[in-house]
């Protein structure tokens, strides 16, 4: 079983005696910067010149500097920008300002684990990764609670990297809920596998396949959408609340029996073999190389995939049906169809 840390396992004064730079001010960046500041930590935010986030960060009372100046001032740097941008940002704007005794923090291990970022030997390399989106991390902290975090140390140059990591996690509010000890390797590989095989790739293609099966068999697209996509939220909510057992307890006897007899026909040993192949590509670095190569080329594959998937018939059907639900109209007012959130 994993080792879990709580507030009593951390000394907040350790992080309060550091100069922290949060690089990036997106979903996670704003939560980290604000929570640390409200925990008595000296925080500055590092942003590129012209960033649209500068005004937002300053309006929330934070000191904003260029990335270079923020890193020069700080002795602890938390990198909270997209994976594909970290390598260049690190090489050009962060690495020149690192000194022995500094600490480099991440919320995801992709670039460190796969070797795209290699810190000097005299620098601590640590991770504090909230298991929730930034606005929830901030909301829970403000309400006196917290979101669970993953904590790990890749390089303990100072001899106190673990103490520093736990202190950071406490300032973030994560140890109110619990900090689960892991490693950069474990966090990175399980995170990528979950995204690709189950949560994003697996789920989206399962929904599409179910939709296609029903429509091809002559059923109305609207009925197919309701049955294989729209009701997904209810199912996921039950699983989040009480696991698969609560889901099966909550559904009808007919649905439960169908789960037992038909689920294994869809998710069979062949699917597990494919999942293992996906995991192999993650573990051996093949996926990382493919992703970075695509990003370095201007993301032609990603753009092609995105454009192609947007044309799937389930999208047009869902767009019309969602208009029938008045409470969904404003549920995603920060989403622009065809755009990318990052």
Curated annotation (Swiss-Prot):
Active site: 108
Keyword Amino-acid biosynthesis among record annotations: yes
Sequence positions that bind Mg(2+) 2: 191, 227, 231
GO cellular component: cytosol
Domain KARI C-terminal knotted: 183-328
Organism: Cutibacterium acnes (strain DSM 16379 / KPA171202) (Propionibacterium acnes)
GO terms for MF: ketol-acid reductoisomerase activity; magnesium ion binding; NADP binding
Residue sites binding Mg(2+) 1 per the record: 191, 195
One Gene Ontology biological process: isoleucine biosynthetic process
Keyword Transferase annotated: no
Residues noted as binding NADP(+) in the record, renumbered to the chain: 25-28, 48, 51, 53, 83-86, 134
Similarity section: Belongs to the ketol-acid reductoisomerase family.
Binding site for substrate: 252
Entry protein name: Ketol-acid reductoisomerase (NADP(+))
HAMAP family named among the record's database cross-references: IlvC
EC number(s) recorded for this UniProt protein: 1.1.1.86
Reactions it catalyzes: (2R)-2,3-dihydroxy-3-methylbutanoate + NADP(+) = (2S)-2-acetolactate + NADPH + H(+); (2R,3R)-2,3-dihydroxy-3-methylpentanoate + NADP(+) = (S)-2-ethyl-2-hydroxy-3-oxobutanoate + NADPH + H(+)
Pathway: Amino-acid biosynthesis; L-isoleucine biosynthesis; L-isoleucine from 2-oxobutanoate: step 2/4; Amino-acid biosynthesis; L-valine biosynthesis; L-valine from pyruvate: step 2/4
Function summary: Involved in the biosynthesis of branched-chain amino acids (BCAA). Catalyzes an alkyl-migration followed by a ketol-acid reduction of (S)-2-acetolactate (S2AL) to yield (R)-2,3-dihydroxy-isovalerate. In the isomerase reaction, S2AL is rearranged via a Mg-dependent methyl migration to produce 3-hydroxy-3-methyl-2-ketobutyrate (HMKB). In the reductase reaction, this 2-ketoacid undergoes a metal-dependent reduction by NADPH to yield (R)-2,3-dihydroxy-isovalerate.
Gene3D superfamilies: 6.10.240.10, NAD(P)-binding Rossmann-like Domain
Cofactor(s) listed: Mg(2+)
Stretches assigned to the KARI N-terminal Rossmann domain: 2-182
Cofactor binding notes: Binds 2 magnesium ions per subunit.
Keywords recorded for this protein, A-Z: Amino-acid biosynthesis, Branched-chain amino acid biosynthesis, Magnesium, Metal-binding, NADP, Oxidoreductase
């Amino acid at each position: 079983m994993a080792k879990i840390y709580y507030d009593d396992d951390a000394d907040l004064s350790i992080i309060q005696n550091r100069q922290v730079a949060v690089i990036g001010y997106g979903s996670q960046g704003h939560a980290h910067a604000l929570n640390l500041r409200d925990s008595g930590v000296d925080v500055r935010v590092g942003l590129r010149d012209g960033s649209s986030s500068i005004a937002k960060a300053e309006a929330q009372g934070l000191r904003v500097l260029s990335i270079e100046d923020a890193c020069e001032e700080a002795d602890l740097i938390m990198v909270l920008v997209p994976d594909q941008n970290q390598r260049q940002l690190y090489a050009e704007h962060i690495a020149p300002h690192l000194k022995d005794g500094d600490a480099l923090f991440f919320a995801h291990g992709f670039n460190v684990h796969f070797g795209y970022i290699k810190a000097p030997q005299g620098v601590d390399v640590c991770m504090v990764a909230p298991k929730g989106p930034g606005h929830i991390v901030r909301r829970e902290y403000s309400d006196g609670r917290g979101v669970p975090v993953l904590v790990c140390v890749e390089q303990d140059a100072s001899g106190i990297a673990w103490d520093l990591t736990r202190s950071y996690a406490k300032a973030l509010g994560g140890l109110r809920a619990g900090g689960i000890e892991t490693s950069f390797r474990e966090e990175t590989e399980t995170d990528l596998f979950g995204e690709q095989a189950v949560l994003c790739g697996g789920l989206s293609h399962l929904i599409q396949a179910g939709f296609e099966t029903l429509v091809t068999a002559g059923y109305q697209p609207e009925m197919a959408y309701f049955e294989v996509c729209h009701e997904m939220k209810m199912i996921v909510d039950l699983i989040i609340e009480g696991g698969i057992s609560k889901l099966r307890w909550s559904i009808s006897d007919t649905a439960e029996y169908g789960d037992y007899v038909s689920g294994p026909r869809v998710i069979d040993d062949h699917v597990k073999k494919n999942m293992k192949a996906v995991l192999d590509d993650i573990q051996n670095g093949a996926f990382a190389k493919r992703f970075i190569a695509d990003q370095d080329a201007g993301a032609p594959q990603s753009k092609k995939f995105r454009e192609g998937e947007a044309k799937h018939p389930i999208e047009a059907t869902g767009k019309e049906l969602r208009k029938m639900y008045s409470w969904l109209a404003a549920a995603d007012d920060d989403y622009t169809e065809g755009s990318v959130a990052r």
